[in-house]
């Protein structure tokens, strides 16, 4: 017996997990024995006895039917229309047992009937079943079915599956049965996993040619999502010449001619066309190549004078995750600027053995060769480069005895550099990137030899500079890239902390810098690019120890902004610092 002097414990609730199951099992037993059944459901030629309370508690449809003042609420026999008796039997069994038998032969009828009866749990289970059955041969059918019944969860899943497996999907018969609007929706997606844009063009043409008589009128509309600036002109021309239908061939030739006229349009019009960045940039999930160009290399523990300028170029495949070598630069150089324009990689300026260069080289991935193009007006190393409005901009840098503060612009059509303005703050070995038609410069080293925190934006059209909030940390030899409407400042160096592993992100929405996850390795003079929604950081140099020169790095890290984590991937073939990286 409890001690009467002890305080009584408060009552505590206890629950039984089996209670609901036992009650449901007993109710089902009563249904099978036709005990207490108060309604008969007539489905086609078959009738099912059940309990109004159980039906109303399981389904808003039945709750409205029996309690909403409808005539069925007082009838002993209630007809259920639009459902086959065998399917209704399965759903009624689920109401009384919580178990549903789903198979490939009944899943579509089940999900339609369950949706009508507002049995959301059965709809969910059917969707999960279809997700488990999806493959490249049936995903289009599942996509169309989910669109037809407005099942948004299954629609999103099947659509994502089509994007990921596009190369397998578009070769199947179901792909050719897409409606025009469904096809266009798929072809517009940034998420198509493709090797190149030409595969999307072929898929569109394949759909048109399947029923040319009826689909001829949709040619322009269906081909509109194709990013023609990314298609090799000769390959496209060869395809068009091979089209047997005369009218279709003429239509394609007209489209190609219009595209070529846009590419050769006057500078003012070209500025407008290049604002349509979705047409000139590869899709987010397209196969891309990272080109690591030039830089210098030095062994760990070597002397400062042991650094060697590089001419070698490596290419990283985002699909295979391997590095391979490609044609080398004509001129070995470090501290250069690297960018991409018109499907070509440009290597600009730089230095070797204290000789600063003004020369520019251009790499054609089709011919796999570097060629020399026009030189800048001023030699520069530690400069910033980016592409804006169809031209290359080269900013600042070290020009010999001082820091250059001029801005040059390269027009590929005229093969000419011209000075177009000046920097607000002279700097070299700074970060530079373009975003939505504006050029951003961050950090670097000033005229006084001090590492900077400052952040500025340049408008190439108005030629005006505007200050933005400074970074939290002074950084020179940093890497910068734009990703998801933010700008990232990665690593770098300052005299107090040496090589940095910290990373800051500028949010335009919040108008401030915030720190994100740090890299695994401190790096200065590394390269940073945004690819497929991720940041790739390659090479650079580590911190110096015991007055020894820091060694160059061959490691590569990838930052995922969604998980705020860094992952190491395959190393470069050659360690390098103060090189450049371009994405094609």
UniProtKB/Swiss-Prot annotation:
Pfam families: BACK (PF07707), BTB (PF00651), Kelch_1 (PF01344), Kelch_KLHDC2_KLHL20_DRC7 (PF24681). The keyword tRNA-binding does not apply. One of its GO terms (biological process) is proteasome-mediated ubiquitin-dependent protein catabolic process. GO terms for cellular component: actin cytoskeleton; Cul3-RING ubiquitin ligase complex; cytoplasm. One of its GO terms (molecular function) is actin binding. Disulfide bonds: none annotated. Its main location: cytoplasm. The keyword Cytoplasm applies. Kelch repeats lie at residues 289-343, 344-390, 391-437, 439-485, 487-533, 535-583. This is Actin-binding protein IPP. May play a role in organizing the actin cytoskeleton. InterPro entries: BACK, BTB-kelch_protein, BTB/POZ_dom, BTB_POZ_IPP, Gal_Oxase/kelch_b-propeller, IPP_BACK, Kelch-typ_b-propeller, Kelch_1. It is found in: Cytoplasm, Cytoskeleton. Keywords: Actin-binding, Cytoplasm, Cytoskeleton, Kelch repeat, Repeat. Residues 37-104 form the BTB domain. SMART domains: BACK, BTB, Kelch.
């Amino acid at each position: 017996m409890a001690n009467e002097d002890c305080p009584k414990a408060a009552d505590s609730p206890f629950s039984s997990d089996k209670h609901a199951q036992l009650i449901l099992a007993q109710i089902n037993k009563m249904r099978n024995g036709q005990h207490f059944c108060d309604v008969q459901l007539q489905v086609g030629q078959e009738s099912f006895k059940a309990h109004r309370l159980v039906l109303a508690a399981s389904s808003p449809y039945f709750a409205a039917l029996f309690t909403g003042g409808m005539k069925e609420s007082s009838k002993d026999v209630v007809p259920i229309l639009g459902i086959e008796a065998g399917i209704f039997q399965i759903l009624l069994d689920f109401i009384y047992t919580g178990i549903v038998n789903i198979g490939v032969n009944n899943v579509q009828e089940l999900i339609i009937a369950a949706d009508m009866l507002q049995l959301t749990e059965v709809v969910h289970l059917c969707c999960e079943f279809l997700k488990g059955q999806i493959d490249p041969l049936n995903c289009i059918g599942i996509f169309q079915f989910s669109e037809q019944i407005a099942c948004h969860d299954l629609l999103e899943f099947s659509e994502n599956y089509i994007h990921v497996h596009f190369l397998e999907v578009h070769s199947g018969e179901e792909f050719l049965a897409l409606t025009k609007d469904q096809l266009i929706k798929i072809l517009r997606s940034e998420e198509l996993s493709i090797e190149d844009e030409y595969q999307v063009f072929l898929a569109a043409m394949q759909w048109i040619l399947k029923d040319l008589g009826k689909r001829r009128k949709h040619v322009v509309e269906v081909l509109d999502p194709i990013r023609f600036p990314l298609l090799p002109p000769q390959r496209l021309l060869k395809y068009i010449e091979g089209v047997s239908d005369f009218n279709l061939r003429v239509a394609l030739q007209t489209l190609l001619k219009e595209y070529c006229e846009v590419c050769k349009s006057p500078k003012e019009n070209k500025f407008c066309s290049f604002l349509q960045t979705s047409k000139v940039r590869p899709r987010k999930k397209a196969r891309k190549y990272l080109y690591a160009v030039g830089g210098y290399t030095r062994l760990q523990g070597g002397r400062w004078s042991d650094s060697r300028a590089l001419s070698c170029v490596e290419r990283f495949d985002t699909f295979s995750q391997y590095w391979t070598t490609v044609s080398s630069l004509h001129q070995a150089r470090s501290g250069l600027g690297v960018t991409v324009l018109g499907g070509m990689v440009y290597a600009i300026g730089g230095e070797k053995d204290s000789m600063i260069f003004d020369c520019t080289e251009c790499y054609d991935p089709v011919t796999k060769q570097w060629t020399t193009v026009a030189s800048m007006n001023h030699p520069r190393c530690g400069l910033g480069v980016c592409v804006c409005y169809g031209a290359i901009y080269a900013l600042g840098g070290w020009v010999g005895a001082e820091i250059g503060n001029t801005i040059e612009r390269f027009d590929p059509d005229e093969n000419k550099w011209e000075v177009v303005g000046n920097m607000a703050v002279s700097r070299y070995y700074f970060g530079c990137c373009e975003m939505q038609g504006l050029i951003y410069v961050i950090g670097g080293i000033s005229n006084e030899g001090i590492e900077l925190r400052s952040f500025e934006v340049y408008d190439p059209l108005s030629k005006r500079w505007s200050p933005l909030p400074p970074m939290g940390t002074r950084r020179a030899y940093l890497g910068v890239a734009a990703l998801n409407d933010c700008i990232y400042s990665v690593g770098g160096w300052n005299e107090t902390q040496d090589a940095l592993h910290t990373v800051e992100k500028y949010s335009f929405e919040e108008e401030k810098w915030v720190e994100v996850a740090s890299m695994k390795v401190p790096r200065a003079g590394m390269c940073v690019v945004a690819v497929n929604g991720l940041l790739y950081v390659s090479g650079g140099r580590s911190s110096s120890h015991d007055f020894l020169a820091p060694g160059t790095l061959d490691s590569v890290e990838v930052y995922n902004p969604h998980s705020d984590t860094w992952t190491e991937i395959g190393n470069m073939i050659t360690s390098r610092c103060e090189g450049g990286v371009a994405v094609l």
